[in-house]
A protein has these predicted regions:
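Active-site region of glycoside hydrolase catalytic domains
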Residues: 137-252, 257-281, 303-309
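Bacterial N-terminal signal peptides
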Residues: 9-22
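The substrate-binding groove and active-site-proximal loops of carbohydrate-active enzymes
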Residues: 50-53, 86-98, 123-133, 159-169, ...
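Acidic/histidine-rich helix-loop elements
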Residues: 46-63, 83-94, 227-255
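Aromatic-rich peripheral "rim/lid" segments of glycoside hydrolase catalytic domains that contact
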Residues: 286-357
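An active-site-proximal structural segment forming one wall of the substrate-binding cleft
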Residues: 58, 66-75, 93-121, 126-155, ...
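N-terminal carbohydrate-binding accessory modules
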Residues: 27-78, 91-92, 266
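N-terminal secretory signal peptides that target proteins for export/translocation
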Residues: 1-7
Length: 357
């Protein structure tokens, strides 16, 4: 799994000359953001809790899973990297992490998956925004330099779920600074910026992006109602003891529709594509209810023209069991468009390997 990680991401570099082109016009950049969003289509979050970042200890994610993800019908992977713990006192990132990230991107690209690099240190950032700001700027300066002229299909996501002690104004200021760092040597890179994480869909209206930078996709996450999606979650004192909460009534669906359409209205006003970067329901909920929920979210995102990424491939909320090498079939089938199940060789490959959970 770790063999060859230190070498450059060759497949990413083949078309690296694209990144060296002059900055595109605002209209062309907006077109690129929209095109990238369409190409991302459906995806899945990966590697958030995997030991790959620590050199392979307790690392259940295997190289062959990239092909299995593509064969199942997914078009991108959102790579969850909590990088701050791998930075030294000067905020220099451990070069071994860059080598491991190179390997992940190379495998994604080799399997026709768009890689989204998600800086995932939301806990630390929500608790200590000032320290977060320094680390985030340092991280993206190093990442932008490392991938300048390389891997043009890779997308940079600035930060997972900004919020907590961050104010919208503080986040807007940091976004401007990080974008300046990235644009210095990645003028054509598509970037994802999250709105402040909130259960209120109108919170997105507080996000302020540089009007001249149109190659940006805006991320939102959706887990409402939390009493359903997080019932039984042992890390939550609010929801750990909850059980038996259902989802799927017409009222349930209307609330989701109203929330997402409010976000979509902002998207159309601002001319910014939307990315549903996380959604899902924890395993304690009944499987049929989980399928109804995830299927409805994915279908609604497709109807609105949004790319989406299910949370997550393995560990909790799992779409795949690495201990048995089995997909959670009802969830995968619920996420995918029903009219495309048997229409591609990729789906045929997935179907030949499917097993019941």
């Amino acid at each position: 799994m770790l063999a060859g990680m230190a070498k450059p991401a060759v497949l990413c570099a083949v078309m690296g000359f694209v990144c060296a082109l002059p900055a595109a016009s605002p209209c062309a950049a907006q077109d690129k953001a929209a095109a990238t969003a369409r190409q991302m289509a459906g995806g899945v979050n990966i590697l958030g809790y995997d030991g790959i970042w620590d050199g392979g200890v307790d690392a259940p994610f295997k190289q062959r899973y990239f092909k299995m993800i593509r064969d199942a019908g997914f078009h991108h992977v959102r790579i969850n990297l909590s990088a701050f713990k791998y930075m030294d006192s000067r905020n220099d990132l451990d070069l071994r992490i860059l080598a491991r990230l190179d390997w992940v991107l190379e495998q994604a690209v080799a399997n026709d998956l768009i890689p989204v690099i998600d800086e995932h240190d939301y806990d630390q950032c929500q608790r200590n925004p000032d320290e977060c700001g320094m680390k985030l700027l340092a991280f993206w300066k190093q990442l932008a330099g490392h991938y300048a002229g390389r891997c043009p299909t890779a997308v940079f996501e600035l930060l997972n779920e900004p919020g907590g002690k961050m104010t919208a104004a503080w986040w807007n200021t940091l976004v401007q600074s990080v974008l300046q760092v990235i644009r210095a040597n990645n003028p054509a890179r598509t970037v994802i910026v999250a709105a402040i994480n909130s259960e209120d869909p109108l919170e997105i209206r507080k996000l302020e992006l540089p009007p001249q930078d149109r190659n940006i996709i805006v991320a939102v996450h959706y887990y409402k109602p939390m009493m359903f999606t997080h019932q039984g979650a042992p890390w939550s004192w609010r929801f750990a003891l909850l059980r038996g909460i259902d989802w799927g009534s017409e009222d349930d669906k209307s609330r989701v529709t109203n929330d997402l359409e409010a976000v979509d209205a902002w998207s159309k006003e601002q001319g910014r594509p939307i990315y549903l970067g996380e959604f899902g329901a924890y395993e304690a909920a009944a499987m049929d209810a989980r399928v109804r929920y995830t299927s409805f979210l994915a279908r609604t995102a497709r109807r609105l023209g949004w790319p989406w990424a299910y949370w997550q491939f393995d560990h909790d909320f799992a779409l795949f069991h690495t201990d048995t090498d089995q997909w959670v079939i009802p969830l995968v089938d619920g996420l995918m468009p029903h009219d495309t199940h048997a229409e591609t060789s990729e789906r045929a490959n997935y179907s030949s390997r499917r097993t019941t959970p």
